Amino acid sequence: MTSSVSTMHNNQDQQTTQLDFITLGIESSCDETGIGLYHSELGLIGHELFSSVKIHAEYGGVVPELASRDHIQRVLPLIKAVLADVKFTLQDLSGIAYTAGPGLAGALLVGCAVAKSLAWSLDIPSLAVHHMEGHLLTPLLEESQPEFPFVALLVSGGHTMLIDVKAIGQYKILGESLDDAVGEAFDKTAKILGLGYPGGPALAMLAEQGNYGAFKFPCPMVGRPGLDFSFSGLKTFVRNTFAKYPSKKEDIAKAFEVATTQTLMIKCRRALEQTKYATLVVAGGVSANLSLRKKLNQMGQKLDVNVFYPRQEFCTDNGAMIALVGYFRLSHGQHDTHHEINIKPRWSLEELSQIE
């Protein structure tokens, strides 16, 4: 379990008033149970996270049933821990936000059921939050924040997309992966090379030992117009190369990372040129990759573009981002209109409403 309370905003002696709006956020879309607490005046005041990655590691990937069972065990103790850290109670809450999708249906149901039950018992509103909107807006938790409009690159195990972000809730998808998400490609490539799960961090560490230029892998779809991605062919290229050169794991990992990060950088540059925006936001689990950050920062310097990321601990799934989005929307009057369980394992960002 990891626990963190924002020292910049936190004041444990702070007493709630009628003007305070305190949002509890619950994240349970996959294999991590995250709880966040966002205060209208103090910002993020606490968050807790438990990852069940060790449970799934022996299976080489996330087992949905095991993930759901673990969420059931963790969610209430984590909520209690977050509230206890800041000396608040359930009665201090103004609203509860939960991840309703996209994600694993069983895992989503756990967070949804807990959020709706608590909200009903406390007579406060609940709100369904889009998981990827949470990632997209996570940099707004930092002191240095992006201003709208901006281009967003969302890169995770389940998604790779470029988005035109004009305002909160006003999203247009410019391009997305036609097959494997980049995070999935990292995990599958790691598996081909015999690395452990989760594969992304293990592959990045192995790539640090590789020789640049020992192999040159293609950058998929950069030779054609548009902003869509495709990484399944690159994965096949890795498999064929590894079959010929099984002793060159480090160099293969390096070539794969170079090709993927170069592809992402090229597509980001196109999106920025197309929109004429001067700000890029990068979020999702793969945004933690240091090679990707280096490439995008270099691109930003050349194009005079400001590039923003979440802090490392908020690149992966977390409850803080759900509490943040929940605060934005709940404080503007948006909320669930009924207490029925409602999840959306498949849910497009373009379906979301703008905050008025």
From Swiss-Prot:
SUPFAM superfamilies: Actin-like ATPase domain (SSF53067). CDD domains: ASKHA_NBD_TsaD_bac. Its EC number is 2.3.1.234. GO terms for molecular function: iron ion binding; N(6)-L-threonylcarbamoyladenine synthase activity. One of its GO terms (cellular component) is cytoplasm. Pfam families: TsaD. Binds 1 Fe(2+) ion per subunit. It catalyses: L-threonylcarbamoyladenylate + adenosine(37) in tRNA = N(6)-L-threonylcarbamoyladenosine(37) in tRNA + AMP + H(+). InterPro entries: ATPase_NBD, Gcp-like_dom, KAE1/TsaD, Peptidase_M22_CS, TsaD. Its main location: cytoplasm. GO terms for biological process: tRNA threonylcarbamoyladenosine modification. Its cofactor is Fe(2+). Keywords: Acyltransferase, Cytoplasm, Iron, Metal-binding, Transferase, tRNA processing. It is an enzyme of class 2 (transferase). The keyword Ion transport does not apply. It is found in: Cytoplasm. Fe cation binds at H131, H135, D317. The keyword Acyltransferase applies. Substrate binds at L154, V155, S156, G157, G158, D187, G200, N289. It comes from the Bacteria. Required for the formation of a threonylcarbamoyl group on adenosine at position 37 (t(6)A37) in tRNAs that read codons beginning with adenine. Is involved in the transfer of the threonylcarbamoyl moiety of threonylcarbamoyl-AMP (TC-AMP) to the N6 group of A37, together with TsaE and TsaB. TsaD likely plays a direct catalytic role in this reaction. Belongs to the KAE1 / TsaD family. PANTHER family: TRNA N6-ADENOSINE THREONYLCARBAMOYLTRANSFERASE (PTHR11735), TRNA N6-ADENOSINE THREONYLCARBAMOYLTRANSFERASE, MITOCHONDRIAL (PTHR11735:SF6). This is tRNA N6-adenosine threonylcarbamoyltransferase. It comes from Ruthia magnifica subsp. Calyptogena magnifica. The gene is tsaD.
